[in-house]
Amino acid sequence: MQNIPTGVILLNMGGPTQTKDVRPFLYNLFSDREIIPLGPRLMQKPLAWLIAKRRAPKSAATYERIGGGSPLKQITEAQAEALEKSLQAHGNFTVTYAMRYWPPYCDEALDYLLSKGVERLVALSLYPHYSKATTGSSLTQLHKTLKKKNISLPLTEIPSWPKQRDYIAAIAANIKKGLATFHGEKTEIVYSAHSLPTSFIEAGDPYVEHTKQSIGAIEEITGKRGRLCFQSKSGPVEWLEPSTPDVLIQLAQEGVKNILMVPISFVSDHVETLYEIDILYKKQAKKLGMRLTSCPSLNTQEQFITGLRQLVLESSVNSD
């Protein structure tokens, strides 16, 4: 497959690039029934409009705290460029990206790849842990767009990669560097993953199991155990527990003084890392008498890009 012109699409969530984009971004997000079904199907979009209107002011203020918008588009574009460069010695690859809830969407990505003359497609999710709400929704949208455009090119999907060797090694290296900043003081490692409604897991979603697989593989390298918790819950449904704020309270009660927080389900910086972890949770930890430092997101770290390259190459071999 490597000699066949191949288009790689990185799939990610997307985010508002300016504060004026926040409300329409939220509308797009809550219009997706694969994340949160809002009553009968015909009520999904009207309710999404109301929720977006209500939440937009607070959400926009949050984005103002991290520079006025999400950096996810720029980071994902940089990841695509780095991956294409990494693949150059291995075949004829063109790499682009498609966001789920804010431009550029799948149709733009496909138009670009077709203009490059690709004959095969690889859809690589930038969510290492599969969930119907993330990778599942992105792949559904990709298939809809392919059908709408009447594109019948061979498609290989890479929906999850919780134990990919280079991904695991890159996080383990970041953890070791993070622990070194505490100069030998006892430090608790906390893995913070994005939360999901528990109904997803009860319906068979492998997200939590995939997350635990990643942590287990990381701990084999570091030799250090950590705690898993879940952040960013919203809405009146039951969410995965324990929540990250609750774990911070628990650690303070246990007398912990130092915390290294690892954004385990996030490979790129965005509002959940730059605001929730680096601002909210650091502030909470300080109030509780603890020092909290976070590991950086992988973004375009060389070893992480190597891992993405290996995923693409392995999928190419397997599909031949």
UniProtKB/Swiss-Prot annotation:
Assigned keywords, A-Z: Cytoplasm, Heme biosynthesis, Iron, Lyase, Metal-binding, Porphyrin biosynthesis
Amino acids binding Fe cation: 194, 272
Keyword Iron: yes
SUPFAM superfamilies for the chain: Chelatase
GO molecular function, one term: ferrochelatase activity
Biological or metabolic pathway of the protein: Porphyrin-containing compound metabolism; protoheme biosynthesis; protoheme from protoporphyrin-IX: step 1/1
Location of the protein in the cell: Cytoplasm
UniProt similarity note: Belongs to the ferrochelatase family.
Protein known as: Ferrochelatase
Organism: Desulfotalea psychrophila (strain LSv54 / DSM 12343)
Gene responsible for this protein: hemH
